[in-house]
């Protein structure tokens, strides 16, 4: 996949911008708060119709403006298409070649994007909800069917919890049965995806960190039943056994909405035994595993966004990373406050932009 051109208007603090990213490496540099991350966020939006940072839709619109727009010219599977995201008030509208997109699944494969930001490393030490969010977001990028099963499960969960809160027993059994059926489908998606990520992870970690330490990512379901033929019945029995407790606490206490991921290094929990550098390398290796999995899915590499990467990696790890993505011919956009560490890796096919107060200024390829 290749993002040939991107155009923004009234997006956050960027009033207007139009650039043609380099085929391989584009570096955007400038002080904090100038709009670098906003620009990367807009690219993620094109591929996913939602930002990678927590944000309300109106927050995406420049102060004092009524709407915002992002347009990208994308080459995927040998076909060139124009994706437009238009934001107005609290609504988002997406078109592909002037045809309205009504389902998120219709965007699938048009512009696959993997993003790494400083916030991602925090999921190593934060609670299970953060890791579930990461898992589900990355899973959706490679599996369009997942989104439907995800929404089905959480819609049923919401309805069941509503009955529990009002102590309505009528209909609860039916919703519980539906929750078990939907839950198993969700768990199977997560199990299969995590297993493949784990197969890819070790090599990526060694390439980035330059270490031979064994690393792994393992799916930890709240209820262990995904490998059984009668998994739905097993999950249903757990829900039934929890019935009285759920009524007492007015919420569904067990199930896939309590799942987690276990990150390990040297067969020990990463959050307790991994250094800060190892934790950062682990998460970045996880992102590289995502890249490979998306290539397996779509037959071509996705777009890679690296936000403030210089603050997360030392010089050796960053050199290893950039060497790896160049070998794989990945299109990469990087933001940084200090361009100096990147000057040695900039080549004739690179592009350098200075970002200041929402304005992007092209400064050549950064080579002497």
Swiss-Prot record:
The record's listing under Pfam families reads: SMC_N
Q: Which residues bind ATP?
A: 30-37
* Gene behind this protein: recF
Instruction: State the GO CC annotations.
Output: cytoplasm
What is the top-level taxon of the source organism?
A: Bacteria
Q: Record's family? A: Belongs to the RecF family.
| Gene Ontology MF terms in the entry | ATP binding; single-stranded DNA binding
Question: Keywords on this record?
Answer: ATP-binding, Cytoplasm, DNA damage, DNA repair, DNA replication, DNA-binding, Nucleotide-binding, SOS response
Give its localization: Cytoplasm
Q: Which GO terms describe its biological process?
A: DNA replication; DNA synthesis involved in DNA repair; double-strand break repair; SOS response
Q: What does this protein do?
A: The RecF protein is involved in DNA metabolism; it is required for DNA replication and normal SOS inducibility. RecF binds preferentially to single-stranded, linear DNA. It also seems to bind ATP.
Identification of the protein by name: DNA replication and repair protein RecF
């Amino acid at each position: 996949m290749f993002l040939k051109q991107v155009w923004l208007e009234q997006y956050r603090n960027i009033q207007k911008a139009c650039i043609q990213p380099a085929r391989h490496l584009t570096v955007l540099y400038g002080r904090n708060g100038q709009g670098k991350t906003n620009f990367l966020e807009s690219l993620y939006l094109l591929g996913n119709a939602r930002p990678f940072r927590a944000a309300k839709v109106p927050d995406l619109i420049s102060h004092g403006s009524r709407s915002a727009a992002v347009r990208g010219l994308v080459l995927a599977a040998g076909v060139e298409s124009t994706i437009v995201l238009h934001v107005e008030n609290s609504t988002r509208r997406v078109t592909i070649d002037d045809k309205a997109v009504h389902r998120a699944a219709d965007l699938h494969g048009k512009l696959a994007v993997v993003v790494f930001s400083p916030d991602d490393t925090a999921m190593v030490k934060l609670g299970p909800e953060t890791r579930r969010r990461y898992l589900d977001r990355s899973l959706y990028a490679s599996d369009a069917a997942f989104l439907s099963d995800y929404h089905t499960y959480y819609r049923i969960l919401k309805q069941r919890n509503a009955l529990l809160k009002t102590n309505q027993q009528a209909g609860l059994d039916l919703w519980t049965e539906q929750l078990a059926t939907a839950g198993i489908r969700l768990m199977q998606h997560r199990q299969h995806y995590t297993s493949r990520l784990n197969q890819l992870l070790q090599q990526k970690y060694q390439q980035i960190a330059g270490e031979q330490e064994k690393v792994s990512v393992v799916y930890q379901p709240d209820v262990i039943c995904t490998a059984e033929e009668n998994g739905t019945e097993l999950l249903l029995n757990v829900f039934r056994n929890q019935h009285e407790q759920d009524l007492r606490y007015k919420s569904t206490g067990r199930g896939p909405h309590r799942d987690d991921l276990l990150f390990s290094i040297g067969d020990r929990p990463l959050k307790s035994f991994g250094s800060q550098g190892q934790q950062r390398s682990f998460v970045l290796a996880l992102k590289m595993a995502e890249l490979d999995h998306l290539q397996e899915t779509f037959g071509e590499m996705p777009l890679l966004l690296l936000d403030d990467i210089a603050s997360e990696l030392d010089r050796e790890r960053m050199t290893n990373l950039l060497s790896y993505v160049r070998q794989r011919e990945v299109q990469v956009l990087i933001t940084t406050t200090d361009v100096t560490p990147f000057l040695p890796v900039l080549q004739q096919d690179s592009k350098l932009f200075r970002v200041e107060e929402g304005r992007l200024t092209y400064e050549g390829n950064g080579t002497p």
